[in-house]
């Protein structure tokens, strides 16, 4: 596999929670969700630390004879052991959660697993992503819009409470599936494959895709993101893109 391009730009929070890698015939992008529960004070580590540890552990688990879900579950188990105590019970929705797109070339097939709003774009046309979280995003927007219209006091606190309630639905029966420090989340992921015939494959976190859907050009987006960072007046999400082509 040949890496044609990779770029990750930290957002306004100045603590990049995106990770990516191209390792042998494997490629992934993952997007750590914003911390809503003061993880450093509660657990002693940050979302960014957890994501970087996962990025270091995952290549060691990448064996072609193993399924992608098994590989990811094993990697998460190691990260869990590094950060969480086996003597305690955790609500994994309050520890770091993350979206992911994880794939590999096996012969003339590309196979992949994914959860959340990361994206795989084939030949700049065919888009693969998990849309199951979209209704929750829309519900959040509507509730926050109502709060603003009502001019509620302490709006920032109330908005955060909206996001917290949604986060508590992570991997719950009435909620949505997402990556977490529970290894079982890997087995909740969507999966697919397609015959590979030489096309470019683009992997993106939502921070990059949201601009790609407007500009349609990776180079234009990178330029625009740099300009927005210099301007400093716009709140930006972390944004990551990886472009690869099979051998």
Describe the role of every protein-language-model region.
Residues 1-247:
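PP2C/PPM-type serine/threonine phosphatase catalytic domain
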